[in-house]
């Protein structure tokens, strides 16, 4: 066992982005440790388990840190490989039969697709306590990785998307008030433009995944219009067509943000060419008059991992968030989020051990204490007091409460069939940004026709 301590194979190519455990699960992990220790160093010592995904930067470092105590206790070597084209490459690997032990997808819809094609191993075959899993991660999240009653997906990280980043001091200095409704936000944007500045940062270039930021805007709007969560769920499952009037209304509201003169720093050219990880940078710089480049940035909680080093410590204080504004006040509050879901390609003993650890609350203990961590545990029992970053305590509590109240909804594009959610939806949002509001009908009709 000693020789395996602190061993970690970590291979990354070009990068783009894209807790308290229940007692039975803790006992099972401790039993695993005792069993391995009783076997003269452990029958799994030196076994390598491979994982592929799209984690980058500080996210990849946190993912590595999560496995350190597990590797120390079991002797299993966890190897992670990331790629800027993970979504495309994992398809090639599955079709060729040359798969890793796990894939970590940011799209549960891709997990379902892989399961439907016969590539994934059910969690039951990994000896996972399914009741425990559902209790710890909510029936909603578990359902996202379920096909015909069989659970294939393991929930991992979560992030909150229904937030807008801003700097309170910059608002206060100019007498701006945090908006609570869409109309308030538009009025504030108009005031900022009238004052000679740009209200929004907005950049959605992401190499092969360009366009997903606009889909996030669409999803937040969909949750707050029409019939709220009910119509959102119908949209995701295609009970509601993509060119339905409710969806067109959402696209029209999004177009207001993208195409109103002066709203976005750099205009539509910047929207389609600015790397999403750098999109908020103008907020952190000042012009000759001391004005920031933008005042609001609608982006998920993970974005702090992409901020300039000098700004990360101010997350939750100097730069914090307000909830995405309500649009129809008659609808109950809802929270949009995203996250990672893994699938396993075999049921080796080492794979089973890693799967059980990844579903434990303790999996995130070593991640949470990192000051640069921007990922949040999706485990409803995770001890959020462990988060080192002040903003993570706020966001972590919000996610846990939303999951418990069944008001949390996953990113729609990540739930749709890959050819739509990670294909035509992304592409047509890029086209919409370039072509303008007159392209809305064409964009929605094109996406509708692409649905398999």
Language-model regions, residue ranges each:
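Short, well-ordered beta-strand elements
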Residues: 46-57, 76-81, 102, 152, ...
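Extracytoplasmic "Venus flytrap"/periplasmic binding protein-like
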Residues: 66-137, 143-146, 169-180, 295-296, ...
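Extracytoplasmic/periplasmic substrate-recognition and gating elements
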Residues: 68, 95, 173, 302, ...
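Extracytoplasmic ligand-binding clamshell segments of periplasmic binding protein
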Residues: 87-88, 204-206, 227-310
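A structural signal for short loop-to-beta-strand junctions that line the ligand-binding cleft
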Residues: 92-94, 100-101, 130-169, 199, ...
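Hinge/lid segment of periplasmic solute-binding proteins
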Residues: 108-163, 186, 192, 213, ...
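Extracytoplasmic/periplasmic solute-binding protein
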Residues: 150-156, 186-240
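C-terminal capping/gating helix-and-loop segments adjacent to ligand/active sites or protein-protein/ligand interfaces
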Residues: 374-381, 393-452
């Amino acid at each position: 066992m000693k020789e395996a301590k602190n061993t970690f194979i970590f291979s990354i190519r070009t990068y783009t982005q894209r807790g308290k455990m229940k007692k039975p699960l803790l006992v099972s992990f401790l039993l695993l440790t005792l069993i391995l220790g009783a076997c003269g160093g452990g029958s799994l010592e030196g076994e390598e388990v491979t994982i592929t995904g799209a984690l980058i930067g500080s996210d990849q470092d946190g993912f590595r840190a999560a496995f350190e105590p597990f590797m120390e206790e079991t002797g299993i070597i966890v190897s992670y490989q990331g790629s800027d084209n993970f979504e495309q490459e994992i398809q090639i690997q599955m079709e060729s039969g040359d798969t890793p032990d796990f894939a970590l997808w940011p799209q549960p819809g891709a997990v379902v697709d892989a399961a439907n094609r016969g590539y994934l191993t059910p969690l039951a075959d990994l000896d996972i306590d399914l009741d425990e899993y559902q209790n710890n991660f909510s029936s909603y999240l578990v359902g996202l990785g379920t096909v015909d009653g069989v659970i294939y997906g393991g929930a991992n990280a979560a992030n909150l998307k229904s937030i807008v980043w801003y700097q309170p001091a910059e608002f206060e200095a100019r007498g701006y008030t945090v908006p609570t409704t869409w109309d308030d936000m538009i009025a504030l944007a108009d005031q900022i433009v009238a004052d000679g500045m740009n209200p929004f940062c907005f950049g959605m270039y992401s190499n092969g995944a360009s366009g997903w930021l606009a889909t996030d805007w669409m999803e937040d709007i969909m949750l707050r219009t029409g019939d709220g969560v009910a119509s959102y769920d119908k949209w995701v499952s295609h009970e509601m067509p993509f060119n339905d009037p409710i969806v067109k209304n959402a696209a029209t509201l999004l177009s207001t943000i993208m195409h109103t003169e002066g709203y976005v720093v750099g205009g539509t050219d910047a929207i389609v060419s600015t790397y999403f990880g750098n999109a908020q940078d103008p907020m952190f710089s000042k012009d000759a008059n001391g004005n920031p480049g933008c005042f609001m940035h609608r982006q998920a909680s993970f974005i702090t991992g992409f901020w300039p080093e000098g700004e990360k410590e101010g997350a939750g204080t100097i730069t914090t968030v307000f909830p995405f504004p309500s649009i129809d006040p008659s609808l109950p509050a809802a929270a949009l989020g995203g996250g990672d879901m893994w699938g396993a390609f075999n049921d080796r003993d080492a794979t089973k051990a890693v799967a059980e650890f990844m579903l434990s609350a303790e999996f995130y203990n070593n991640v949470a204490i990192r000051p640069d961590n921007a990922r949040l545990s999706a485990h409803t029992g995770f001890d959020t007091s462990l988060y080192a970053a002040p903003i993570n305590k706020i966001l972590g509590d919000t996610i846990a409460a939303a999951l418990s109240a069944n008001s949390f909804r996953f990113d729609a594009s990540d739930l749709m069939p890959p050819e739509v959610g990670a294909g035509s939806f992304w592409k047509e949002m890029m086209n919409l940004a370039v072509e303008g509001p007159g392209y809305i009908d064409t964009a929605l009709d094109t996406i509708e026709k692409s649905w398999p």
